[in-house]
Amino acid sequence: MAMIDPLENNLFDLPDYENTEDETFPPLPPPTSPGRGDAEWAQANGDPDGNQQSETKDSSSAARKAVKRSIPKLDANRLVSERGLPALRHMFDNVKFKGKGHEAEDLKTLLRHMEHWAHRLFPKLQFDDFIDRVESLGNKKEVQTCLKRIRLDLPILHEDFTANEGGGGESNGLDMATEEVHSFSGNVGELDSLPGTTLTEEQQQRIKRNRQLALERRQAKMQCNSQSQHDELSPSYPEEELNIPVARDLTGALEDTQVTATNVAVTETEDRERELQCASEKQ
């Protein structure tokens, strides 16, 4: 095998650094010079794009200083929001449970709807963690107030207030019958007492009609209350027990009459004996 001569084919030829001229570079500005990064200084030194690096640095620093988005949290305000506890009031309106003998299926249906509600309210938590978090939030004042309003069927959201304004008169008509009667009578008295105020026939008829409706509602309510009280008393107190006081009163009256008659007869007998005794003494 032939050896290769390293001097052949100029394998180890080195460049002639002694006779090679160095590249010319623009001088660097001093560290404290105000011209560093200046566009005029860059153009004067043959670097028209010298300010691009500074612009990119400024943009990157501005991007780093951007305000971070707040991470949503499962707190009391979110729990009492529209998708929170108020949504549970109407969640099971269209759900039909199978009843006795199908308790396991009904429980699965209940849990499935509750998991759906929890996912819509706060998707980042698993259902078990969500339950623990809600349990810890149960002592908050906002949550307690929301639960009380739900139990008392009071309006919570804006839609509840608008719904009550639209249909509150019909639903609570019987409960407000007495107040309506007093309010109508008071309004009529005030209108009559005000000087210079005249009511048209239509207004008077409307007032009379409203008063009549209020009176009818009040009578219906009183009749329902009396009927319910009678129904409650009748099974617990049979008719025989209810008639016992009357029978006792009649018996007592008869006994008093008999005692009075006996006393009168005794008195008359004593008077006759005294008269006979006086007559015998005179003779």
Curated annotation (Swiss-Prot):
The keyword Lyase does not apply. It is found in: Cytoplasm; Nucleus. Residues 74-150 are annotated as: Interaction with TIMELESS. One of its GO terms (biological process) is mitotic intra-S DNA damage checkpoint signaling. Residues 15-24 have a biased composition (Acidic residues). GO terms for molecular function: DNA binding. Keywords: Cell cycle, Cell division, Cytoplasm, DNA damage, Mitosis, Nucleus. The keyword Nucleus applies. It comes from the Eukaryota. InterPro entries: Csm3, TIPIN/Csm3/Swi3. Residues 1-68, 186-205, 217-238 are annotated as: Disordered. One of its GO terms (cellular component) is replication fork protection complex. It holds the Pfam family Swi3. Interacts with TIMELESS, which impairs TIMELESS self-association. PANTHER family: TIMELESS INTERACTING-RELATED (PTHR13220), TIMELESS-INTERACTING PROTEIN (PTHR13220:SF11). Belongs to the CSM3 family. Plays an important role in the control of DNA replication and the maintenance of replication fork stability. Important for cell survival after DNA damage or replication stress. May be required for the replication checkpoint induced by hydroxyurea or ultraviolet light. This is TIMELESS-interacting protein. It comes from Gallus gallus. The gene is TIPIN.
